[in-house]
């Protein structure tokens, strides 16, 4: 079976979130997007299926939200990126399932993964001030990032 890779990267434009440079330290540290991640967190709380959401906490290049949906764990990595040529300021959300060793060994289907992607899509599509929402798979994202 030749299945299309999942589109788990969403790129969008918005002036709702800050592009302010850090006052101290090296350029771009901490990464931009904490306010965007906090916004997504608050909007995800409105969905009944989301039983837990923690963060945002800072990783090396993104702000991460830890989400539990229907007993399944996911991470949302939220960050700023220059996309396309010529480069355009964009926001990116990368959605990843978090599985333990047993989950990877037995590859049980994730029943709630598509629901989480739909919830994120609904948040972005219905928020005034967010535009140019594009879902991509890893290869598509790598080609524009």
Task: Give the positions of each predicted feature.
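Short, intrinsically disordered low-complexity segments
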Residues: 38-74
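Long protein-protein interaction modules used by eukaryotic assembly/scaffold proteins
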Residues: 6-23, 27, 63-145
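Sterically constrained small-residue positions within well-ordered secondary structures
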Residues: 3, 56-58, 84
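N-terminal low-complexity, intrinsically disordered segments
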Residues: 1-51
